[in-house]
From Swiss-Prot:
Part of the 50S ribosomal subunit. One of its GO terms (biological process) is translation. NCBIfam families: rpmD_bact. One of its GO terms (molecular function) is structural constituent of ribosome. The lineage of its organism: Bacteria, Pseudomonadati, Myxococcota, Myxococcia, Myxococcales. This is Large ribosomal subunit protein uL30. Belongs to the universal ribosomal protein uL30 family. Keywords: Ribonucleoprotein, Ribosomal protein. Gene3D superfamilies: Ribosomal protein L30, ferredoxin-like fold domain. PANTHER family: LARGE RIBOSOMAL SUBUNIT PROTEIN UL30M (PTHR15892:SF2), MITOCHONDRIAL RIBOSOMAL PROTEIN L30 (PTHR15892). Pfam families: Ribosomal_L30 (PF00327). One of its GO terms (cellular component) is cytosolic large ribosomal subunit.
């Protein structure tokens, strides 16, 4: 099971605690939707900001979160590739 969370109201004037919760759900701006795994933690976060979001239970699983390389490693790999390209030419 998965939860579809959608930000339906503006979070202007919300406390910093609520803003952190909204960011924790992966919502960045008005109208954003996320498909999240149905866990007690996610349900608790959604309940905390229930006046700003809508919840919908969806059959199937939520997609696995994508992992990103830390910026330092990605930058190093690009620099190595650039140097190799310069040495080749």
């Amino acid at each position: 099971m998965a939860l579809k969370v959608k930000l339906v109201k503006s979070f202007a004037g919300a406390s910093s605690d609520m803003l952190d919760t909204i960011r924790g759900l992966g919502l960045k701006k008005f109208g954003d939707e996320r498909l999240l795994k149905d866990t007690p933690a996610v349900r608790g976060m959604a309940f905390k900001v229930k006046h700003l979001v809508t919840l919908e239970t969806v059959s199937g699983d939520a997609p696995a979160p994508k992992r990103r390389k830390p910026a330092k490693i990605a930058l190093r790999e690009r620099a190595i590739a650039y140097q190799a390209k310069q040495n080749k030419a």
